[in-house]
């Protein structure tokens, strides 16, 4: 299988008939499977309007936030740079 050096994603957000719970479920599924597509030293560049979802779900799935940038205070948009956490012995 081919593994990626980086994954760049613009995550969906609550709008119209889509509920916040449905968006949370998408984040759960994304963080639950993305490690299978990344090299060990791979990174995720993630654009999000759901800042509160990113850190806890990333940590729960073996990722850490290297950097966080606020893009628009008005729109509540952020870019996160994440990498995988490994136990180094």
What are these model-predicted stretches?
Residues 1-89:
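Class I S-adenosyl-L-methionine-dependent methyltransferase catalytic core
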């Amino acid at each position: 299988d081919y593994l990626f050096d980086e994954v760049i994603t613009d995550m969906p957000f609550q709008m119209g008939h889509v509920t916040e719970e449905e968006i949370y479920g998408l984040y759960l599924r994304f963080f639950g499977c993305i490690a299978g597509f990344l090299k060990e030293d791979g990174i995720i560049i993630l654009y999000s309007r759901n800042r509160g979802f990113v850190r806890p779900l990333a940590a729960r799935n073996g990722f850490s936030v290297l950097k966080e940038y606020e893009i628009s205070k008005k729109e509540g948009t952020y870019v996160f740079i994440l990498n995988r956490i490994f136990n180094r012995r």
